[in-house]
Amino acid sequence: MTERTLILIKPDGVERGLIGEIIARIERKGLKISALDLRVADRETAEKHYAEHADKPFFGELVNFITSAPLIAGVVEGPRAIEAWRQLAGGTDPVAKATPGTIRGDFALEVSTNVVHGSDSPESAEREISIWFPNL
């Protein structure tokens, strides 16, 4: 069964020139990129994306960071795409949970600037894709 997931290469990943490396890892894994867009996220999109964290103390920091500079938003498809992308990305905490060989394990040091985002469930994927790519 083909599954879709949203991926973001966050502003820190774009600024550090990691787009090509990350896209290459996606393609080597066998996933298909069905949408890709370089953009600066507006505040409304960021707040919708992070709505589940709206009551947490770090919400403002998340929104400010994701809207601070260009990012890549994309949709990736394939069998078990959500799990496959999360495996490529590595744990949210790049030092404590992301193993070497993952994107975060190789390229990040802080939770707040951990290079990439990926949906964590089919429901989240559909919600997030509709926020970033409403016409898909």
From Swiss-Prot:
The EC number of this protein is 2.7.4.6
Q: Which InterPro entries match?
A: NDK-like_dom, NDK-like_dom_sf, Nucleoside_diP_kinase, Nucleoside_diP_kinase_AS
Signal sequence region: none
* Alphabetical list of Gene3D superfamilies matching this protein: Nucleoside diphosphate kinase-like domain
Gene Ontology BP terms: CTP biosynthetic process; GTP biosynthetic process; UTP biosynthetic process
User: Per the record, what are the reactions this protein catalyses?
Assistant: a 2'-deoxyribonucleoside 5'-diphosphate + ATP = a 2'-deoxyribonucleoside 5'-triphosphate + ADP; a ribonucleoside 5'-diphosphate + ATP = a ribonucleoside 5'-triphosphate + ADP
**Names of required cofactors:** Mg(2+)
Q: Does the keyword Magnesium apply?
A: yes
**Keyword set for this entry?**
ATP-binding, Cytoplasm, Kinase, Magnesium, Metal-binding, Nucleotide metabolism, Nucleotide-binding, Phosphoprotein, Transferase
Residues binding ATP, per UniProt = 10, 58, 86, 92, 104, 114
Which terms in the Gene Ontology molecular function aspect does this entry carry? ATP binding; metal ion binding; nucleoside diphosphate kinase activity
The yes or no answer to whether the keyword Nucleotide-binding is present is yes
Domain of life of the source:
Bacteria
Protein location: Cytoplasm
Catalytic-site annotation from UniProt: 117
Gene Ontology CC terms, in alphabetical order? cytoplasm
User: What does this chain do?
Assistant: Major role in the synthesis of nucleoside triphosphates other than ATP. The ATP gamma phosphate is transferred to the NDP beta phosphate via a ping-pong mechanism, using a phosphorylated active-site intermediate.
Q: Which family does it belong to?
A: Belongs to the NDK family.
How the protein assembles, per its UniProt entry?
Homotetramer.
Task: Return the protein name.
Answer: Nucleoside diphosphate kinase
